């Protein structure tokens, strides 16, 4: 009898799971092929309409009458640039460096290291009055250790890049320096020991007066600039990777702006030389309009010159969208770009976790009277826990997407580490808006990924829902109290926001059409007359939507929401039509990341930090670029079924069956 009861229990559980799975299947199909599917399945038709417009033709050179003459001018400019003295010197120097033997580099490092140690003792025991910095013996020791394997090697730098898995992985996987580029340098450059000795003494002479770490950074920056001017796509990867660490510098926004400008210059030069292409599409047009509004928000403003400088910074960083959309035109480059972002996020998250457990964090970010059991909130390299949380909300869905599409054990371990570290660091920010953003992003991702993930989500939600009354006993008390305070009016942060939003709404009523201009100075100068008691110190509205509405007026907020709507139309349409499961997953992850930040933006002004402003539009551009790359790849492989532009075909692979839906003008479905 006991065996029969067990079998009945197993069957009962199977029936429950099957019922939930069928419900998830039904819900998923309703989402994909219902109103939602119809609403987000017509982006391509709008793109085709825009492609025939005068704006598109002007931007893409379609109205140039004498194309042959224009082409001759471009070729002449390209030849004059490529034959210039500067370019020839650079190519010759690069050839020498790549064909130089590693033992020459080892000689440079060994002599430089010894001289730097000598300088350390000179400064320490002489009467120069200069106190030696610890970087002297650190750099000297690193140089000496690095010189040992180099002195024993017989390979050239090009050989090392070809043969070393680590060097080749960085060169190819990060910078895009493929084998064709490396194989150009085959001959040995000879034994240039005198040059190595002279270079070592020159470096030591410079480090005598300047911190040697500064000299190393200057050389690295110069090398990266040369690399970016050669491969502008590498500039995007370098910028995205270095962005979090710019927060450790004195001027992070200025440094980020310079990196974007250098990459833009490289792209412009390649464009003139016909080495890259520029395609102006519907989304690009909308972003240009929004950027123009932000620029004029710095011209016509209550904030004066500071607002104008802020508007210029916004416009320069917004150009990062066009760099990603036009340089990352292949899935290979897009994968490199995503990996650069996620690898950087691992270091940021790891530092944040270490900071929480081993470094005393700043307690001023938390109301210790209400949350006495929370020691502080991690900031990692960003200096602000809420800013860090936005960064992690953007990274986490992409990490999950790559993990779910990984098959190799090494990649599964690597992406699992990314997910765990990003999630742990996000929790330790104690950012309630960040937590809501992560929850919203993950719910959207799993609900749209497949009906199986919907089933898992529902199965997980049931026990969690039943356990809600007991979460206080299961989870740490500090976590429960922090999360429960989201809607609490007792928390000082919540009270501050409620009062601030009331004052901001009153400002919007009086500046409904034109706004007050961009920047914190514009807000501070006007808000004083509307401030609610206790919120006089506010420098922004703590809401993305209210801030855009207040800064740019009704036109600005409508245009922003329209751009977001177009992004989701573009992304979901491509996700549903794509034959590439990985591409669809990445697009969905990007949309989920944007959705998570938009949820967080309801309670915080996430664009206050310029780095986050850039990263928002970076992920935005990733979705557009991946959709375009996937669309163009399929157009090369498949012939369109119908040329009828009033119809939109959606193909979606589900459980080895292909569903096809045609949505006609009347909105009816034919399955």
Task: Annotate each PLM feature.
Residues 394-396, 553-565:
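Hydrophobic alpha-helical transmembrane segments
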Residues 208-209, 249-252, 300-308, 427-428, ...:
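Membrane-interface helix caps and helix-loop-helix hairpins in membrane proteins
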Residues 1-296, 305-306, 329-339, 405-412, ...:
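Transmembrane signal-anchor hairpin modules in multi-pass inner-membrane enzymes, especially those
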Residues 366, 487-502, 506, 510, ...:
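Long extracytoplasmic/lumenal interhelical loops at the membrane interface
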Residues 156-169, 372-378, 469-503, 509, ...:
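Flexible juxtamembrane loops connecting transmembrane helices in multi-pass membrane enzymes
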Residues 305-309, 382-386, 429-433, 539-543, ...:
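Membrane-interface catalytic loops of GT-C/OST-like multi-pass glycosylation enzymes that act
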């Amino acid at each position: 009898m006991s065996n029969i009861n067990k079998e009945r229990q197993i069957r009962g559980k199977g029936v429950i799971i099957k019922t939930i799975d069928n419900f998830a299947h039904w819900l998923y199909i309703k989402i994909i092929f219902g109103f939602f599917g119809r609403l987000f399945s017509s982006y391509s038709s709008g793109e085709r309409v825009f492609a025939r417009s005068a704006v598109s033709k002007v931007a893409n050179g379609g109205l140039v009458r004498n194309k042959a003459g224009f082409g001759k001018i471009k070729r002449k400019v390209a030849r004059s640039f490529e034959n210039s003295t500067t370019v020839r010197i650079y190519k010759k120097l690069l050839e020498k460096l790549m064909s130089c033997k590693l033992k020459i580099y080892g000689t440079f490092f060994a002599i430089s290291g010894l001289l730097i140690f000598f300088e350390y003792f000179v400064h320490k025991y002489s009467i120069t009055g200069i106190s030696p910095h610890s970087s002297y013996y650190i750099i000297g020791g690193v140089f000496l250790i690095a010189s040992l394997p180099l002195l024993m090697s017989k390979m050239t730098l090009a050989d090392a890049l070809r043969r070393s898995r680590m060097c080749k992985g960085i060169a190819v996987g990060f910078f895009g320096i493929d084998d064709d580029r490396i194989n150009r340098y085959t001959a040995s450059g000879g034994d240039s020991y005198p040059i190595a000795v002279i270079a070592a003494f020159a470096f030591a002479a410079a480090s005598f007066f300047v911190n040697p770490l500064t000299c190393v950074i200057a050389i690295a920056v110069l090398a990266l600039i040369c690399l970016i001017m050669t491969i502008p796509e590498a500039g995007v990867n370098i910028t995205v990777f270095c962005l979090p660490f710019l927060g450790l510098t004195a001027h992070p926004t200025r440094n980020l702006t310079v990196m974007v400008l250098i990459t833009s210059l490289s792209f412009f030069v390649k464009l003139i030389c016909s080495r890259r292409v520029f395609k102006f599409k519907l989304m690009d047009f909308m972003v240009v309009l929004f950027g123009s509004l932000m620029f004029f928000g710095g011209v016509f403003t209550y904030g004066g010159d500071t607002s104008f400088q802020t508007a210029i910074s916004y416009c320069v960083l917004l150009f990062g969208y066009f760099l990603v959309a036009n340089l990352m035109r292949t899935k290979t480059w897009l994968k490199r770009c995503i990996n650069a972002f996620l690898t950087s996020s691992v270091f940021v998250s790891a530092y944040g976790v270490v900071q929480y457990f081993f470094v005393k964090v700043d307690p001023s970010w938390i109301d210790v009277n209400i949350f006495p059991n929370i020691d502080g909130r991690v900031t990692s390299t960003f200096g602000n826990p809420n800013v860090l949380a936005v960064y992690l909300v953007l990274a986490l869905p992409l990490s999950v997407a790559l993990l779910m599409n990984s098959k190799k054990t090494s990649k599964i371990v690597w992406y699992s580490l990314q997910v765990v570290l990003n999630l742990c660091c996000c929790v330790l920010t104690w950012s309630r808006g960040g937590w809501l953003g992560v929850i919203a992003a993950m719910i959207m991702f799993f609900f749209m990924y497949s009906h199986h993930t919907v089933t898992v989500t529902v199965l997980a939600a049931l026990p969690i829902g039943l356990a809600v009354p007991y979460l206080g006993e299961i989870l740490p008390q500090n976590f429960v109290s922090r999360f429960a305070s989201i809607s609490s009016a007792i928390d000082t942060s919540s009270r501050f926001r409620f009062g601030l939003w009331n004052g901001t709404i009153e400002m919007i009523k009086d500046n409904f059409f034109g706004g007050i201009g961009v920047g914190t100075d514009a807000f501070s100068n006007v808000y004083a007359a509307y401030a609610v008691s206790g919120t006089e110190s506010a420098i922004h509205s703590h809401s993305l939507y209210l801030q855009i509405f207040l800064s740019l007026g009704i036109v600005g907020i409508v245009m922003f929401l329209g751009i977001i709507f177009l992004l989701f139309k573009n992304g979901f349409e491509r996700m549903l039509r794509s034959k590439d499961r990985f591409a669809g997953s990445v697009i969905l992850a990007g949309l989920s990341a944007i959705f998570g930040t938009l949820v967080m933006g309801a309670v915080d002004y996430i664009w206050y930090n310029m780095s986050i402003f850039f990263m928002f539009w970076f992920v935005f551009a990733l979705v557009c670029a991946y959709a375009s790359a996937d669309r163009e790849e399929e157009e090369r492989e498949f012939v369109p079924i119908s040329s009828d532009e009033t119809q939109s075909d959606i193909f979606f692979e589900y459980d080895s069956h292909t569903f096809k839906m045609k949505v006609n003008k009347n909105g009816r479905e034919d399955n």
